[in-house]
Amino acid sequence: MDKFTKSFEADTSKILNIVINSLYSDRDIFLRELLSNASDAIQKRRFQGQTTPILLNSEDDQIEIVINKKKKYIEIKDNGIGLNDEELSETLGTIAKSGTAGFLKEIEDNKDSKSAAQSLIGKFGVGFYSAFMVADTVEVTTQKAGTNVAYTWVSDGQTGYDISKAEIDHPIGTSVRLFIKKD
Protein backbone atom coordinates (compact mmCIF):
# COMPACT_ATOMS: atom_id res chain seq x y z
CA MET A 1 0.00 0.00 0.00
CA ASP A 2 1.32 3.44 -0.92
CA LYS A 3 1.65 5.91 1.89
CA PHE A 4 -0.28 9.15 1.70
CA THR A 5 -0.66 12.07 4.06
CA LYS A 6 -3.85 13.98 4.67
CA SER A 7 -4.76 16.91 6.87
CA PHE A 8 -7.32 16.61 9.61
CA GLU A 9 -10.71 18.05 8.82
CA ALA A 10 -12.88 19.68 11.43
CA ASP A 11 -16.15 21.45 11.98
CA THR A 12 -14.62 24.74 13.03
CA SER A 13 -17.72 26.08 14.76
CA LYS A 14 -17.89 22.97 16.99
CA ILE A 15 -14.19 23.13 17.81
CA LEU A 16 -14.45 26.83 18.61
CA ASN A 17 -17.39 26.14 20.91
CA ILE A 18 -15.48 23.34 22.69
CA VAL A 19 -12.35 25.49 23.07
CA ILE A 20 -14.27 28.45 24.46
CA ASN A 21 -16.46 26.52 26.85
CA SER A 22 -13.78 24.16 28.14
CA LEU A 23 -11.17 26.85 28.76
CA TYR A 24 -13.42 29.39 30.38
CA SER A 25 -16.01 28.85 33.10
CA ASP A 26 -16.46 32.53 33.96
CA ARG A 27 -18.36 34.39 31.24
CA ASP A 28 -16.78 37.69 32.28
CA ILE A 29 -13.30 36.45 31.31
CA PHE A 30 -13.80 37.92 27.81
CA LEU A 31 -13.20 41.43 29.15
CA ARG A 32 -9.87 40.52 30.72
CA GLU A 33 -8.80 38.74 27.54
CA LEU A 34 -9.70 41.66 25.27
CA LEU A 35 -8.06 44.18 27.59
CA SER A 36 -4.94 41.98 27.59
CA ASN A 37 -4.95 41.99 23.78
CA ALA A 38 -5.28 45.80 23.76
CA SER A 39 -2.40 46.13 26.23
CA ASP A 40 -0.24 43.80 24.14
CA ALA A 41 -1.01 45.87 21.00
CA ILE A 42 0.16 49.04 22.74
CA GLN A 43 3.34 47.29 23.93
CA LYS A 44 4.04 46.07 20.38
CA ARG A 45 3.62 49.60 18.98
CA ARG A 46 5.99 50.99 21.63
CA PHE A 47 8.56 48.26 20.98
CA GLN A 48 8.46 48.54 17.19
CA GLY A 49 8.48 52.33 17.50
CA GLN A 50 11.98 52.15 18.97
CA THR A 51 13.34 51.26 15.54
CA THR A 52 10.55 52.78 13.43
CA PRO A 53 9.66 56.12 15.09
CA ILE A 54 6.74 56.76 12.71
CA LEU A 55 4.86 54.03 14.61
CA LEU A 56 4.96 56.07 17.79
CA ASN A 57 2.09 58.39 18.30
CA SER A 58 1.86 61.70 20.10
CA GLU A 59 -1.16 60.60 22.14
CA ASP A 60 -0.87 58.82 25.45
CA ASP A 61 -1.43 55.07 25.33
CA GLN A 62 -5.17 54.51 25.51
CA ILE A 63 -7.59 51.69 26.13
CA GLU A 64 -11.25 52.65 26.27
CA ILE A 65 -14.33 50.60 27.12
CA VAL A 66 -17.62 51.78 25.61
CA ILE A 67 -20.99 50.32 26.62
CA ASN A 68 -23.94 51.11 24.38
CA LYS A 69 -27.06 49.78 26.07
CA LYS A 70 -29.37 50.97 23.30
CA LYS A 71 -27.51 49.13 20.52
CA LYS A 72 -26.51 46.33 22.93
CA TYR A 73 -22.79 46.26 22.40
CA ILE A 74 -19.58 46.54 24.38
CA GLU A 75 -16.56 47.99 22.61
CA ILE A 76 -12.89 47.91 23.59
CA LYS A 77 -10.71 50.45 21.74
CA ASP A 78 -6.95 50.87 21.82
CA ASN A 79 -4.31 52.90 20.02
CA GLY A 80 -1.91 49.99 19.73
CA ILE A 81 -0.08 48.64 16.69
CA GLY A 82 -3.24 47.61 14.80
CA LEU A 83 -3.49 44.92 12.13
CA ASN A 84 -3.53 44.83 8.35
CA ASP A 85 -5.85 42.56 6.36
CA GLU A 86 -3.37 39.66 6.23
CA GLU A 87 -2.74 39.85 9.98
CA LEU A 88 -6.49 39.94 10.64
CA SER A 89 -6.94 36.77 8.63
CA GLU A 90 -3.91 35.02 10.14
CA THR A 91 -4.53 36.06 13.74
CA LEU A 92 -8.32 36.07 14.07
CA GLY A 93 -9.09 33.63 11.30
CA THR A 94 -6.86 30.90 12.71
CA ILE A 95 -7.89 29.43 16.05
CA ALA A 96 -4.92 29.20 18.46
CA LYS A 97 -2.76 31.48 16.30
CA SER A 98 -1.28 34.06 18.65
CA GLY A 99 0.10 37.30 17.30
CA THR A 100 1.85 37.69 20.63
CA ALA A 101 3.49 34.27 20.35
CA GLY A 102 4.84 35.21 16.92
CA PHE A 103 6.04 38.53 18.26
CA LEU A 104 7.73 36.77 21.19
CA LYS A 105 9.56 34.51 18.71
CA GLU A 106 10.71 37.59 16.81
CA ILE A 107 12.03 39.07 20.07
CA GLU A 108 13.66 35.74 21.02
CA ASP A 109 15.50 35.77 17.70
CA ASN A 110 16.76 39.25 18.61
CA LYS A 111 18.07 38.42 22.09
CA ASP A 112 18.89 42.06 22.92
CA SER A 113 15.17 42.86 23.16
CA LYS A 114 13.99 40.21 25.62
CA SER A 115 12.96 42.70 28.31
CA ALA A 116 10.35 44.19 25.96
CA ALA A 117 8.53 40.86 25.95
CA GLN A 118 8.19 40.52 29.70
CA SER A 119 4.88 42.37 29.93
CA LEU A 120 3.15 40.75 26.95
CA ILE A 121 0.22 38.67 28.09
CA GLY A 122 -1.53 36.69 25.34
CA LYS A 123 0.51 33.75 24.16
CA PHE A 124 -1.90 31.01 23.15
CA GLY A 125 -4.24 32.61 20.61
CA VAL A 126 -7.58 31.55 22.10
CA GLY A 127 -8.45 34.38 24.51
CA PHE A 128 -10.01 36.53 21.81
CA TYR A 129 -12.59 33.83 21.11
CA SER A 130 -13.93 34.08 24.68
CA ALA A 131 -15.86 37.06 23.27
CA PHE A 132 -18.25 34.55 21.69
CA MET A 133 -19.33 33.43 25.16
CA VAL A 134 -21.27 36.70 25.45
CA ALA A 135 -21.58 37.94 21.87
CA ASP A 136 -23.41 36.55 18.88
CA THR A 137 -21.38 38.79 16.55
CA VAL A 138 -17.91 40.26 16.96
CA GLU A 139 -16.71 43.15 14.82
CA VAL A 140 -13.04 44.17 14.80
CA THR A 141 -12.06 47.40 13.05
CA THR A 142 -8.36 48.13 12.89
CA GLN A 143 -5.67 50.20 11.21
CA LYS A 144 -2.05 49.18 11.44
CA ALA A 145 0.35 51.90 12.57
CA GLY A 146 2.29 53.32 9.62
CA THR A 147 -0.51 52.63 7.12
CA ASN A 148 -3.54 54.58 5.95
CA VAL A 149 -5.92 51.67 5.30
CA ALA A 150 -8.34 50.26 7.87
CA TYR A 151 -10.16 46.92 7.80
CA THR A 152 -13.15 45.37 9.52
CA TRP A 153 -13.33 41.67 10.46
CA VAL A 154 -16.82 40.37 11.32
CA SER A 155 -17.81 36.91 12.56
CA ASP A 156 -20.65 35.12 14.28
CA GLY A 157 -18.21 32.47 15.55
CA GLN A 158 -20.06 29.82 13.54
CA THR A 159 -19.83 30.23 9.80
CA GLY A 160 -16.51 31.97 9.26
CA TYR A 161 -15.66 35.63 8.93
CA ASP A 162 -15.67 38.57 6.52
CA ILE A 163 -12.93 41.15 6.04
CA SER A 164 -13.57 44.44 4.26
CA LYS A 165 -11.98 47.88 3.98
CA ALA A 166 -13.31 50.29 6.58
CA GLU A 167 -13.35 53.86 7.78
CA ILE A 168 -11.86 54.44 11.20
CA ASP A 169 -12.27 57.43 13.50
CA HIS A 170 -8.72 57.35 14.89
CA PRO A 171 -5.36 57.11 13.09
CA ILE A 172 -4.15 53.77 14.46
CA GLY A 173 -5.31 50.95 16.67
CA THR A 174 -8.18 48.56 17.04
CA SER A 175 -11.81 48.56 18.09
CA VAL A 176 -13.43 45.27 19.13
CA ARG A 177 -17.21 45.52 19.26
CA LEU A 178 -19.22 42.70 20.84
CA PHE A 179 -22.92 42.56 19.99
CA ILE A 180 -24.28 40.94 23.15
CA LYS A 181 -26.36 37.75 23.03
CA LYS A 182 -29.98 38.01 24.11
CA ASP A 183 -29.72 35.37 26.89
What are these regions, as identified by a protein language model?
Residues 1-180:
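GHKL (Bergerat-fold) ATPase N-terminal catalytic module, capturing the glycine-rich phosphate-binding loop
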